Protein backbone atom coordinates (compact mmCIF):
# COMPACT_ATOMS: atom_id res chain seq x y z
CA UNK A 1 0.00 0.00 0.00
CA UNK A 2 1.44 3.34 -1.07
CA UNK A 3 0.76 6.40 1.04
CA UNK A 4 -0.26 9.62 -0.76
CA UNK A 5 -0.91 13.10 0.58
CA UNK A 6 -4.45 14.37 0.14
CA UNK A 7 -4.32 18.04 -0.80
CA UNK A 8 -6.84 20.82 -0.45
CA UNK A 9 -7.47 23.05 -3.45
CA UNK A 10 -5.17 25.68 -1.92
CA UNK A 11 -2.29 23.20 -2.01
CA UNK A 12 -2.13 22.49 1.72
CA UNK A 13 -2.23 18.96 3.08
CA UNK A 14 -5.55 17.82 4.53
CA UNK A 15 -4.64 14.20 5.23
CA UNK A 16 -3.32 11.07 3.58
CA UNK A 17 -4.66 8.04 1.76
CA UNK A 18 -3.32 4.54 1.21
CA UNK A 19 -3.74 3.37 -2.38
CA UNK A 20 -3.68 -0.32 -3.22
CA UNK A 21 -0.56 -1.65 -4.92
CA UNK A 22 -2.83 -3.98 -6.90
CA UNK A 23 -4.23 -0.93 -8.73
CA UNK A 24 -1.62 1.83 -8.43
CA UNK A 25 1.56 -0.15 -7.82
CA UNK A 26 1.88 -3.00 -10.32
CA UNK A 27 4.61 -3.42 -12.92
CA UNK A 28 3.04 -1.89 -16.07
CA UNK A 29 2.36 -4.40 -18.84
CA UNK A 30 3.47 -2.50 -21.95
CA UNK A 31 2.10 -4.98 -24.48
CA UNK A 32 -1.40 -4.90 -22.95
CA UNK A 33 -1.22 -1.10 -22.72
CA UNK A 34 -0.29 -0.93 -26.41
CA UNK A 35 -3.18 -3.21 -27.34
CA UNK A 36 -5.69 -1.18 -25.28
CA UNK A 37 -4.55 2.11 -26.83
CA UNK A 38 -4.83 0.64 -30.34
CA UNK A 39 -8.33 -0.63 -29.51
CA UNK A 40 -9.50 2.81 -28.41
CA UNK A 41 -7.91 4.57 -31.36
CA UNK A 42 -9.52 2.07 -33.74
CA UNK A 43 -12.92 2.70 -32.14
CA UNK A 44 -12.51 6.44 -32.76
CA UNK A 45 -12.11 5.98 -36.52
CA UNK A 46 -15.14 7.11 -38.52
CA UNK A 47 -14.89 4.38 -41.12
CA UNK A 48 -17.03 6.37 -43.58
CA UNK A 49 -14.66 5.94 -46.54
CA UNK A 50 -16.39 4.73 -49.71
CA UNK A 51 -15.96 4.57 -53.47
CA UNK A 52 -18.36 3.56 -56.25
CA UNK A 53 -18.06 0.14 -57.84
CA UNK A 54 -19.36 -0.61 -61.35
CA UNK A 55 -22.91 -1.11 -60.08
CA UNK A 56 -22.97 2.27 -58.32
CA UNK A 57 -21.48 4.47 -61.06
CA UNK A 58 -24.15 6.18 -63.16
CA UNK A 59 -24.47 5.49 -66.88
CA UNK A 60 -23.05 2.65 -68.92
CA UNK A 61 -26.33 0.90 -69.59
CA UNK A 62 -25.76 0.71 -73.34
CA UNK A 63 -23.11 -1.42 -74.99
CA UNK A 64 -20.58 1.11 -76.40
CA UNK A 65 -20.19 -0.68 -79.74
CA UNK A 66 -21.23 -3.92 -81.32
CA UNK A 67 -19.56 -7.13 -80.25
CA UNK A 68 -17.90 -8.03 -83.56
CA UNK A 69 -16.65 -6.39 -86.70
CA UNK A 70 -15.01 -3.22 -85.34
CA UNK A 71 -11.50 -4.58 -84.80
CA UNK A 72 -11.53 -3.20 -81.28
CA UNK A 73 -11.69 -5.13 -78.03
CA UNK A 74 -15.16 -6.17 -77.01
CA UNK A 75 -16.77 -3.97 -74.37
CA UNK A 76 -20.04 -4.35 -72.52
CA UNK A 77 -20.23 -1.04 -70.63
CA UNK A 78 -18.28 2.19 -70.33
CA UNK A 79 -18.46 1.87 -66.54
CA UNK A 80 -16.23 -1.23 -66.37
CA UNK A 81 -13.08 -0.74 -64.22
CA UNK A 82 -10.72 -0.32 -67.19
CA UNK A 83 -12.62 2.74 -68.46
CA UNK A 84 -11.97 6.30 -67.35
CA UNK A 85 -14.81 7.13 -64.95
CA UNK A 86 -15.55 3.45 -64.45
CA UNK A 87 -16.20 1.68 -61.17
CA UNK A 88 -13.44 0.91 -58.65
CA UNK A 89 -12.53 -2.73 -58.04
CA UNK A 90 -12.28 -3.85 -54.40
CA UNK A 91 -12.36 -0.25 -53.13
CA UNK A 92 -12.96 0.75 -49.49
CA UNK A 93 -16.50 0.50 -48.12
CA UNK A 94 -17.97 1.94 -44.90
CA UNK A 95 -17.05 -0.26 -41.94
CA UNK A 96 -16.45 -0.19 -38.21
CA UNK A 97 -12.85 -0.61 -37.06
CA UNK A 98 -13.89 -1.34 -33.48
CA UNK A 99 -12.97 -4.65 -31.92
CA UNK A 100 -13.26 -6.15 -28.46
CA UNK A 101 -10.73 -6.98 -25.79
CA UNK A 102 -11.14 -9.45 -22.91
CA UNK A 103 -12.33 -7.85 -19.67
CA UNK A 104 -9.27 -9.02 -17.72
CA UNK A 105 -6.96 -7.45 -20.29
CA UNK A 106 -8.90 -4.16 -20.21
CA UNK A 107 -8.61 -3.98 -16.44
CA UNK A 108 -4.93 -4.91 -16.53
CA UNK A 109 -4.35 -2.12 -19.04
CA UNK A 110 -6.09 0.39 -16.74
CA UNK A 111 -4.08 -0.77 -13.72
CA UNK A 112 -0.89 -0.55 -15.79
CA UNK A 113 -1.69 3.00 -16.92
CA UNK A 114 -2.51 4.14 -13.37
CA UNK A 115 0.61 2.47 -11.97
CA UNK A 116 2.77 4.09 -14.64
CA UNK A 117 1.41 7.52 -13.72
CA UNK A 118 2.02 6.83 -10.02
CA UNK A 119 5.60 5.69 -10.66
CA UNK A 120 6.30 8.81 -12.74
CA UNK A 121 5.01 11.07 -9.92
CA UNK A 122 2.12 12.08 -12.14
CA UNK A 123 -0.62 11.34 -9.59
CA UNK A 124 -2.13 14.02 -7.34
CA UNK A 125 -4.92 13.28 -4.85
CA UNK A 126 -7.24 16.11 -3.75
CA UNK A 127 -9.97 16.00 -1.13
CA UNK A 128 -12.77 17.32 -3.38
CA UNK A 129 -13.73 19.95 -5.93
CA UNK A 130 -16.32 22.13 -4.24
CA UNK A 131 -17.35 24.61 -6.90
CA UNK A 132 -20.72 26.25 -6.30
CA UNK A 133 -20.72 27.54 -9.88
CA UNK A 134 -18.55 27.15 -12.99
CA UNK A 135 -15.42 29.29 -12.57
CA UNK A 136 -12.77 28.79 -15.24
CA UNK A 137 -10.33 31.31 -13.76
CA UNK A 138 -10.66 29.77 -10.30
CA UNK A 139 -10.15 26.26 -11.69
CA UNK A 140 -7.06 27.41 -13.59
CA UNK A 141 -5.67 28.92 -10.38
CA UNK A 142 -6.26 25.61 -8.56
CA UNK A 143 -4.24 23.71 -11.17
CA UNK A 144 -1.50 26.32 -10.94
CA UNK A 145 -1.45 26.07 -7.14
CA UNK A 146 -1.20 22.28 -7.37
CA UNK A 147 1.74 22.78 -9.80
CA UNK A 148 0.13 20.80 -12.59
CA UNK A 149 1.53 20.60 -16.15
CA UNK A 150 -0.42 21.71 -19.23
CA UNK A 151 -2.00 18.33 -20.02
CA UNK A 152 -4.07 17.22 -17.03
CA UNK A 153 -6.76 14.60 -16.58
CA UNK A 154 -9.12 15.43 -13.70
CA UNK A 155 -11.03 12.48 -12.24
CA UNK A 156 -14.13 12.97 -10.07
CA UNK A 157 -16.25 10.33 -8.36
CA UNK A 158 -19.42 11.21 -10.27
CA UNK A 159 -20.35 13.72 -12.96
CA UNK A 160 -19.81 17.27 -11.69
CA UNK A 161 -21.23 19.87 -14.06
CA UNK A 162 -19.47 22.77 -12.34
CA UNK A 163 -16.07 21.11 -12.66
CA UNK A 164 -16.71 20.10 -16.28
CA UNK A 165 -17.81 23.60 -17.28
CA UNK A 166 -14.93 25.20 -15.36
CA UNK A 167 -12.35 23.09 -17.20
CA UNK A 168 -13.99 23.05 -20.62
CA UNK A 169 -12.21 26.10 -22.04
CA UNK A 170 -8.77 25.34 -20.60
CA UNK A 171 -6.54 23.81 -23.31
CA UNK A 172 -5.08 20.43 -22.37
CA UNK A 173 -7.41 19.85 -19.41
CA UNK A 174 -9.91 17.00 -19.54
CA UNK A 175 -12.47 15.90 -16.95
CA UNK A 176 -13.82 12.39 -16.52
CA UNK A 177 -15.42 10.22 -13.84
CA UNK A 178 -14.03 7.18 -12.04
CA UNK A 179 -16.41 5.04 -14.07
CA UNK A 180 -15.37 6.66 -17.36
CA UNK A 181 -11.63 6.36 -16.78
CA UNK A 182 -9.83 4.91 -19.80
CA UNK A 183 -6.29 4.08 -20.90
CA UNK A 184 -6.09 6.57 -23.79
CA UNK A 185 -7.03 9.56 -21.61
CA UNK A 186 -4.59 8.51 -18.87
CA UNK A 187 -1.64 8.03 -21.22
CA UNK A 188 -2.37 11.25 -23.15
CA UNK A 189 -2.21 13.31 -19.95
CA UNK A 190 1.02 14.36 -18.27
CA UNK A 191 -0.63 14.31 -14.86
CA UNK A 192 -3.64 12.79 -13.14
CA UNK A 193 -5.59 14.79 -10.53
CA UNK A 194 -8.03 12.50 -8.77
CA UNK A 195 -10.36 13.13 -5.86
CA UNK A 196 -10.11 10.96 -2.77
CA UNK A 197 -13.59 9.52 -3.34
CA UNK A 198 -12.80 8.77 -7.00
CA UNK A 199 -9.58 6.96 -6.04
CA UNK A 200 -11.51 4.71 -3.66
CA UNK A 201 -14.13 4.02 -6.33
CA UNK A 202 -11.42 3.08 -8.86
CA UNK A 203 -9.94 0.69 -6.29
CA UNK A 204 -13.35 -0.92 -5.76
CA UNK A 205 -13.73 -1.58 -9.49
CA UNK A 206 -10.17 -2.62 -10.34
CA UNK A 207 -8.91 -3.98 -7.03
Swiss-Prot record:
The keyword rRNA-binding applies. The keyword Ribosomal protein applies. GO terms for molecular function: rRNA binding; structural constituent of ribosome. Gene3D superfamilies: 3.40.1370.10. GO terms for biological process: translation. PANTHER family: 50S RIBOSOMAL PROTEIN L4 (PTHR10746), LARGE RIBOSOMAL SUBUNIT PROTEIN UL4M (PTHR10746:SF6). Part of the 50S ribosomal subunit. Belongs to the universal ribosomal protein uL4 family. This is Large ribosomal subunit protein uL4. It comes from Staphylococcus aureus (strain NCTC 8325 / PS 47).
Amino acid sequence: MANYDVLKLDGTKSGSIELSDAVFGIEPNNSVLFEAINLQRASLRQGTHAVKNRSAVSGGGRKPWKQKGTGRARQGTIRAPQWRGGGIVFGPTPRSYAYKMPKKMRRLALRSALSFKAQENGLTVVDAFNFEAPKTKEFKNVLSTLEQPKKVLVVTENEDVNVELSARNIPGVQVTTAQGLNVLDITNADSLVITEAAAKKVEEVLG
